[in-house]
Amino acid sequence: MSSVVVVGTQWGDEGKGKITDFLSENAEVIARYQGGNNAGHTIKFNGVTYKLHLIPSGIFYKDKTCVIGNGMVVDPKALVTELAYLHERNVSTDNLRISNRAHVILPYHLKLDAVEEERKGANKIGTTKKGIGPAYMDKAARVGIRIADLLDRDVFEEKLARNLEEKNRLLEKMYDAEGFKIEDILDEYYEYGQQIKQYVCDTSVVLNDALDDGRRVLFEGAQGVMLDIDQGTYPFVTSSNPVAGGVTIGSGVGPTKIQHVVGVSKAYTTRVGDGPFPTELNNEIGDQIREVGREYGTTTGRPRRVGWFDSVVVRHARRVSGITDLSLNSIDVLTGIETLKICVAYKYRGEILEEFPASLKALAECEPVYEEMPGWTEDITGAKSLSDLPENARHYLERVSQLTGIPLSIFSVGPDRSQTNVVRSVYRPN
């Protein structure tokens, strides 16, 4: 048995899709365990760039099983669209498996997401408006509709009718918005269910059988630890648990079957959406990093907020996710910056904080304590090993590893999978 979890150590967009794609080559099963189509990942495969939101990165390998786990919330319309997107590009999806226990995003979730965000005005969270939060709310309230329900027309119709009574009342009375008729949803979404029916099964059985058979299983997280509903910058978070612990709940695999956790980070920090960001750069260096790193959201297209590497954030991620391996991406983006800074702690009302505070009010008052390091000007995009890097780049990686307390296992010097380099295997035995 060999199992590896890939998690983002920051606020998402760390390049998890690329690293998952890279690690997929030596995996036999690739599974997502939380989130929905609010997560976007860009993958280059055989010279072609693909943008996916729901389907795991391993779909491009015909000999590997790809799983959408029970912890995900699935927009059937978005899923059918993504399947068509792959089919048009001659990518087979025969290896896809979808949990019959995953919850379904319906049109009223999308509308509630949008009107609630609009109502909040200046206090908005920065949601992607994909219906993720409202779908997870229904799940917690035990009124959600699952994939298994979607496939049974009678059950789907009964639950949909009951839910629409409540949702329409909410939309019309609280938000002064138009509600839905059952015929607006029933036939269309039942048909989507029929289109994905061939992929639906009990994915917990698929995953546990694979692990028991000694196959390599790779769990692909979405978003990042700082967007985790329990461990992130609440309430500026997602509605699920991207931390490694989310694997056990969101995939139906017990915690004793998880071996290694790869924490993916950029060599700097980015964020989409609102919320405190201690190392944010609102200057020319920030603009340079954004343009060189093409820091625009895969899902939203929004410019990402950019800042220096924050070791306080990544140490927090290491602790709450049990991270065993560091994958550092986008090192090449920092080329040409004369002096680099790494945040080693926060200063809060005269006190030095080395751990991430829970209070957003306190976080907003925190000033980053920086350590400066000399940059490099050499082109590093062709580096294949640490020894190929200029001395200053090597020292930067070493210092990041020291400050976060995570051994460096992978580093990346460009967007292509050929620019991803292994320092030590994450599939090693315990």
From Swiss-Prot:
Q: What is this protein called?
A: Adenylosuccinate synthetase
Which residues does IMP bind?
D13, E14, G15, K16, N38, A39, G40, H41, T128, R142, Q223, T238, R302
State what this protein does: Plays an important role in the de novo pathway of purine nucleotide biosynthesis. Catalyzes the first committed step in the biosynthesis of AMP from IMP.
**What interactions and quaternary structure are annotated?**
Homodimer.
What highest taxon heads this organism's lineage? Bacteria
EC number(s) per UniProt? 6.3.4.4
Cystine residue pairs? none
Subcellular localization, per the record? Cytoplasm
Residues that hold substrate according to the record:
T298, T299, T300, G301, R302, P303, R304
Positions annotated to bind GTP: 12-18, 40-42, 304, 330-332, 412-414
Q: Which residues bind Mg(2+)?
A: D13, G40
Cofactor binding remark: Binds 1 Mg(2+) ion per subunit.
Active site per the UniProt annotation: D13, H41
Pfam families xref list: Adenylsucc_synt
Would you identify the family this protein belongs to, as annotated? Belongs to the adenylosuccinate synthetase family.
Matching InterPro entries, A to Z?
A: Adenylosuccin_syn_GTP-bd, Adenylosuccin_syn_Lys_AS, Adenylosuccinate_synth_dom1, Adenylosuccinate_synth_dom2, Adenylosuccinate_synth_dom3, Adenylosuccinate_synthetase, P-loop_NTPase
- Name the catalysed reactions: IMP + L-aspartate + GTP = N(6)-(1,2-dicarboxyethyl)-AMP + GDP + phosphate + 2 H(+)
What GO biological process terms does the UniProt entry carry, in alphabetical order?
'de novo' AMP biosynthetic process; IMP metabolic process
Which GO cellular component does the record give, naming just one? cytoplasm
